[in-house]
């Protein structure tokens, strides 16, 4: 899980979602997981 100021999709399978007011990226590739913080 990467914590970043700006989250962006890295590949075409990355999905930007909102959970509990946080912007997150979920993907098949675990290295692409990000959340805004």
Swiss-Prot record:
NCBIfam families reported in the protein's UniProt record: rpmJ_bact
Example GO biological process: translation
Gene Ontology CC annotation, any one: ribonucleoprotein complex
InterPro entries in UniProt: Ribosomal_bL36, Ribosomal_bL36_sp
Keyword annotations of the record: Ribonucleoprotein, Ribosomal protein
Molecular function in Gene Ontology: structural constituent of ribosome
Protein name (database record): Large ribosomal subunit protein bL36
HAMAP family reported for this sequence: Ribosomal_bL36
Keyword Magnesium set for record: no
Family (UniProt): Belongs to the bacterial ribosomal protein bL36 family.
Domain of life: Bacteria
